[in-house]
Design a protein with these regions (language model features):
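Conserved catalytic core of nucleotide polymerization and phosphodiester-bond processing enzymes
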Residues: 1-130
Length: 130
């Protein structure tokens, strides 16, 4: 109870999602219908899908601007909130800064109440960049 009283917006979200869940689906961040497995899983479905939707928007922007700027890159993996890319050394810093900017822009696109932030790392192995 104390947790919820300290986070009134979260408590409101939980109540709203629980109400929607009775119909077997909830609305995602972008308005799409998300079928839920159970009412118990509804809040998790909303939160997990929001992360995926924001990340997809960030990747759309990243691809658009990286092509526009003629950067030499390939996106090789998207794992939850992380993107792994192969980028020519000459473009690595610019691509990294662009990726962070695109994540921030994705949050603005969906009018999130808290700003999104990100970071990038440059390396030759996954271990160095994770």
């Amino acid at each position: 109870k104390r947790f919820m009283s300290n986070l009134p917006a979260f408590a409101d979200l939980k109540t709203r999602v629980a109400g929607e869940a009775t119909q077997g689906w909830v609305r995602g961040l972008d308005g799409r219908r998300l079928t839920i497995r159970s009412e118990h899983a509804a809040l998790n479905t909303v939160l997990q899908s929001a992360g995926a939707i924001v990340m997809k928007q960030a990747l759309i922007l990243l691809d658009k601007y990286a092509k526009l700027w003629k950067l030499d890159y390939k996106i090789v993996g998207n794992i939850h909130d992380e993107v792994q890319s192969e980028v020519k050394t000459k473009d690595a810093e610019k691509f990294g800064r662009l990726a962070v900017s695109c994540l921030e822009a994705a949050g603005l696109h969906f009018k999130l109440n808290c700003p999104l932030a990100g970071e990038y790392k440059i390396g030759t192995t996954w271990s160095e960049t994770h």
